[in-house]
Amino acid sequence: MKKYYILPLFVFFLTISFSQKKKNASEELKSSDLTGLKFRSVGPAFMSGRIADIAINPNNENEWYVAVGSGGVWKTVNSGTTWNPIADDQPFYSTGCITIDPHNSSKIWLGTGENVGGRHVGIGHGIYVSENGGKNWKSMGLKNSEHISKIIVSPKDPNTVFVASQGPLW
């Protein structure tokens, strides 16, 4: 009885192992596809490059903002092909959250200080806002909170902003 089960299983697995479509030369990755990408450091900490938060512009799906745990804030205008740091001149390097104002997609809210507890954690300097898509930043307070985990702009009132903060770890 077992012989009858083994043969169909063998035929089935043999069939699916050869059923993949062969790649065309035009489908293969070429070095020219990667010309816009360059290797670069994304942070100074032991575990750099940790994405803390991401925000995508609801009015332009190609424009993204990324808050990096130990690497500042990055922006892309081409869906991630290339990235530019947009807060390197600020007094913080650790970020925890980033939010696009639902009333004005050029207004970006940033919570500094990654909201984790570990040897790699970086403290922040409160909340910052940019009125021009990340070109300039203004401190809005809560400097002693050190770790901002979430910012929500009220959908009814752009002047009401809710903030969640862990507070100092030590």
Where are these predicted regions, by residue range?
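Beta-propeller blade termini and top-face loops
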Residues: 18-170
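Bacterial Sec-dependent N-terminal signal peptides
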Residues: 1-23
